[in-house]
């Protein structure tokens, strides 16, 4: 960098350090607009005072609705705000006072520059006391500033300050007005410190000049108030960028021994017109007004106001605007932009095919929240919408995790994912075929003993099982020798079927072998199991476990839907001829559910209804032996996959058939 450039840089910094403080301290351009009260929005910043007059005036302050309906307030065609008094009604001096309006700002404001542009103020009328002023919430400790005030035939504005204690002002400050009282504190009475402006700054002379502007600059050191006639308004004000340094000599420069920052706190602004009262009534006889009772000037004022309504037609305010300016702020008041964030969670349950899990129906439980259950099984999952009114959950305090499938078990074919319609009800219907068989001998199964339950039904009591019966009045459900997975499209002990899109032409793959893992399930309230006893005769458990028709309603119009088939194989060779099957026609149960389905590894469903139909054309056939040595069953016309159907042909059933054939051969 050259030496000349360095000199210029240092010089610029030095010059800016000298100029910047001067601008910041003395230039009115530091004021920026924060609020503008005008036109239709003028009353948005005010509330109406309708209480009794604190100055004991002969006045009735109207609320907003009455003021609007009676024409006391309105927005003019030019956009100015009109606020007048009743000038039509003759009153009784002993009755309520004349209708008028008093409005107060909704908020309190701090130090700044406040400008009011008046087209008209209440004229020089006997008995009137108009004022535009500010006051703190705790008078007199928070101070009062009377910006515009006059009484009776006033033609010169009077500016007054009120403070607590003692606050003396200097009369040596440069101002165009005349200080008539220098003590602002209440200690010297309620007069306050007063500066009287020149004639023509108030009342009728002010209005004859088409009004003008009053500006108040309030700081922690002083209060200055300027008056500008319409033709003398500074250009910086009309341009919206007021510069108080160019305003010239103020009407009042109020500054003295007291700390203004302590004596004047946050202020609200008030605009009103009252009649008579302590000041206007007290000096009524000294203002050249007609006195009806020389001994009582206040009563003379009341008599005049009550009996001469037309005299107050000019006692109105017409305001073009009130603007608030403060330092260091922008045109708009500061606001915090809040950004609302919303997160939408799509609840769904994901269920994987788990071959070694047995599901148990629970009559009525509730689910605290949807859950996702996934086991290490090579099967695809399908999303199920969350139920609108969840009524299912895993019973008990603990849930047994689903073990991994055994090596001999192959996964069921992949089920297509359901069409998740975000809240649409899932409708699933399943047809279950019931086949009744009869054996002529009792036999012990590999893991349990067939025992009589009652009503011609039997139950297998497992020798070792982790499943506990639910304490419900539902019909007993035979326990499957091989736990079966809860797949989409299945019903569990009469529960709500899981919807599926698998076509009947795509049956599930066969399950080869047995899993040596224990059968986990949802823990249920304990119920004693019947003692295991051997029987000589009995019936094979029904092929399907379904709800009792007497306990559950039967929906009408139910129809079967596509589902996958369940086939259980046995290591025992299939007989060449089957035992007699006492089934004139298979029983078809159509289970319909229109509620949303909730699924988990330990499936528990709400109560579903079943509709029973009978078909004489669909007959169950005996299982036949395959090349692999496993027995298979002939599929019904509409194959289904249910927990009950998985128990229709098991080791216990085949054992009974073999025993029957053996006894027939011995005979």
Swiss-Prot record:
Lipidation (GPI-anchor amidated alanine): 643
Primary location: membrane
Lineage of origin: Eukaryota, Fungi, Dikarya, Ascomycota, Pezizomycotina
Membrane topology per record: Lipid-anchor; GPI-anchor
Region entry Disordered, spans: 361-424, 448-647
UniProt EC number: 3.2.1.6
Location of the GH16 domain: 25-288
Glycosylated sites: 63
Stretch forming the signal peptide: 1-24
Propeptide feature ranges: 644-667
Record-given protein name: Probable endo-1,3(4)-beta-glucanase AO090023000083
Function: Mixed-linked glucanase involved in the degradation of complex natural cellulosic substrates.
A single MF term (Gene Ontology): endo-1,3(4)-beta-glucanase activity
Biased segments, Low complexity type: 397-417, 448-480, 488-502, 517-534, 573-622
Family: Belongs to the glycosyl hydrolase 16 family.
GO biological process, one term: cellulose catabolic process
Keyword annotations: Carbohydrate metabolism, Cell membrane, Cellulose degradation, Glycoprotein, Glycosidase, GPI-anchor, Hydrolase, Lipoprotein, Membrane, Polysaccharide degradation, Signal
UniProt-annotated location(s): Cell membrane
Bias kind Polar residues: ranges: 379-394, 623-637
């Amino acid at each position: 960098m050259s030496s000349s450039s360095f000199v210029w840089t240092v010089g610029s910094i030095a010059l800016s350090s000298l100029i910047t403080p001067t601008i910041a301290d003395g230039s009115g351009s530091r004021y920026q607009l924060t609020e503008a009260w005008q036109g239709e929005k003028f009353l948005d910043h005010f509330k109406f005072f309708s209480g009794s007059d604190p100055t004991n005036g002969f006045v009735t302050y109207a609320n907003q609705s009455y003021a609007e309906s009676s024409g006391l307030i309105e927005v003019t065609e030019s956009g100015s705000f009109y606020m007048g008094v009743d000038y039509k009604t003759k009153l009784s001096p002993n009755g309520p006072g004349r209708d008028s309006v008093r409005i107060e700002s909704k908020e309190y404001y701090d130090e700044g520059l406040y400008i009011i542009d008046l087209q008209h103020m209440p004229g020089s009328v006997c008995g009137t006391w108009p004022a535009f002023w500010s006051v703190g919430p705790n008078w007199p400790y928070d101070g009062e500033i009377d910006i515009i005030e006059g009484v009776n035939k006033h033609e010169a504005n009077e500016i007054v300050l009120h403070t607590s204690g003692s606050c003396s002002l200097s009369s040596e400050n440069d101002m165009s007005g005349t200080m008539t009282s220098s003590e602002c504190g209440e200690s010297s009475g309620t007069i306050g410190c007063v500066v009287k402006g020149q004639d023509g700054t108030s009342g009728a002379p002010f209005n004859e000049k088409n009004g003008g502007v009053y500006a108040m600059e309030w700081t922690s050191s002083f209060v200055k108030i300027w008056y500008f006639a319409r033709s003398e308004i500074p250009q910086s004000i009309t341009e919206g960028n007021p510069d108080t340094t160019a305003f010239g000599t103020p009407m009042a420069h109020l500054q003295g021994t007291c700390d203004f920052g302590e004596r004047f706190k946050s202020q609200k602004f008030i605009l009103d017109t009252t009649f008579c009262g302590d000041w206007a009534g007290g000096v009524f006889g000294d203002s050249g007004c007609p006195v009806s009772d020389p001994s009582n000037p206040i009563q003379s004022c009341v008599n005049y106001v009550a009996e001469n309504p037309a005299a107050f037609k000019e006692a109105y305010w017409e305001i073009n605007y009130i603007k608030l300016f403060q330092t260091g702020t922008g045109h708009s008041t500061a606001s915090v932009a809040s950004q609302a964030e919303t997160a939408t969670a799509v609840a769904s349950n994901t269920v994987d095919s788990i071959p070694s899990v047995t599901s148990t129906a629970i009559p009525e439980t509730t689910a605290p929240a949807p859950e996702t259950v996934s086991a290490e099984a090579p099967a695809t999952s399908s999303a199920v919408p969350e139920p609108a009114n969840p009524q299912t959950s895993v019973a008990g305090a603990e849930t047994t995790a689903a073990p991994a499938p055994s090596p001999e078990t192959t996964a069921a074919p992949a089920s297509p994912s359901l069409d998740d319609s975000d809240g649409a009800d899932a409708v699933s219907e399943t047809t279950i075929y019931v086949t009744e068989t009869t054996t002529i001998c009792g036999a012990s199964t590999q893991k349990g003993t067939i025992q009589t339950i009652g009503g011609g039904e039997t139950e297998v009591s497992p020798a070792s099982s982790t499943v506990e019966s639910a304490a419900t009045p539902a019909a007993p459900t035979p326990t499957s020798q091989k736990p079966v997975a809860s797949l989409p499209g299945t019903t569990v002990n009469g529960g709500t079927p899981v919807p599926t899109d698998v076509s009947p032409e795509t049956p599930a793959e066969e399950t080869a072998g047995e899993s040596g893992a224990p059968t986990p399930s949802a823990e249920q309230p304990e119920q004693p199991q019947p003692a295991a006893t051997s029987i000589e005769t009995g019936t094979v458990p029904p092929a399907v476990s379904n709800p009792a028709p007497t306990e559950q309603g039967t929906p009408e119009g139910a129809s079967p839907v596509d589902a996958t088939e369940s086939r259980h194989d046995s290591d025992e060779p299939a007989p060449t001829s089957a035992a007699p099957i006492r089934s004139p026609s298979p029983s078809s149960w159509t289970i319909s559910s229109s509620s949303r389905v909730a699924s988990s590894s330990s499936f528990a469903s709400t109560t579903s209804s079943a509709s029973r139909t009978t078909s004489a054309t669909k007959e169950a056939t005996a299982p036949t032996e395959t090349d692999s040595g496993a027995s298979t069953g002939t599929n019904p016309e509409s194959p289904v996959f249910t927990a009950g159907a998985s128990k229709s042909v098991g080791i216990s059933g085949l054992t009974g058939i073999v025993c029957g054939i053996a006894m027939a051969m011995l005979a």
